[in-house]
Amino acid sequence: MQHAKHHPEEPETPAMPRRSSLGLRTLTVCIGLPIVLAFVWLGGWAMFALLGLVLVLMTLELRSLMRRTSYRPSLWFSLLLAAFFLVLAMFPQQRPLLLEIGIGVALLLSFPLLFSRLPAQHALSDWGLTLAFAFYLGWPLSCLLLLRGDQAGQLHAIWADIPRGVWWVLLVLLGTWSFDTGAFYIGRAFRGHQHPLAAQISPGKNWEGLIGGTCCAVMGCIILTRPLDLPWYQAVLLGIVVGCAGMCGDLSESFIKRQAHAKDSGTMLPGHGGILDRCDSILFGSVIVYIFSMLVGG
């Protein structure tokens, strides 16, 4: 056993998990990204089906996390309300009226449902979480559908007809992913000299990562808004807001995981963790980009 201590390849073993994890992350992206882009290209009910599946998977991850806490929100009710938001996004003309009716009915039904539970020690918290999770998941995904619209992309020989809705959704996806990537690598570059951003929620987050990630988001938005004919200063402003929204989304999910004493939300995406781990920034970014598109006349 003594000679094993001097094995020439032993110093390399600590790096093996990192290389393996990076390989898994890359493989997951190479497989998943074309699938996501294909559904974004198709739009309409095809994209609705994809987001519906994502909604179910994220709800299951939240269910698993909540089981590790003392809270018991009615996540099936959250799922139904979130799915209702998705359906309404497919009918934008009728959406305002139906939204008011749906939210009103949800409030009236959820209150007696949760408070009829015994014992009722956490009934008020469970009621609040039931509604909060519906908005946390369903509202951002419905914003993606509203941004995309139902005009399908078309291929014409050597060129493509890309609807504006595709560019808006790409702006959400690639804008937030560029922020995540920049924040991760730039934050790591300053490890040991960083300034913590929210140490009690996520010790690994730092101000250097936020600034670096936001700069990457700004550059991404400048490039991706060119087909939308937005002025450069609007693209810069959008990049800054997308960066801040991405960090808020990341910290929000980290807070949920900390409550559950969990490192990842799940294991659905090898190398990345769960669906929520990959989409936390997108949930907040989609709402911001949708509001922005309405303000500039999307």
Spans of model-derived segments:
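Membrane-embedded alpha-helical bundles of polytopic integral membrane proteins
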Residues: 2-241
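Interfacial loop-to-transmembrane junctions
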Residues: 259-282
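Membrane-embedded alpha-helical segments of transport systems
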Residues: 179, 211, 276-284
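Juxtamembrane interface at the ends
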Residues: 184-189, 254-262
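Juxtamembrane boundary at the C-terminal end of a transmembrane helix
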Residues: 291-298
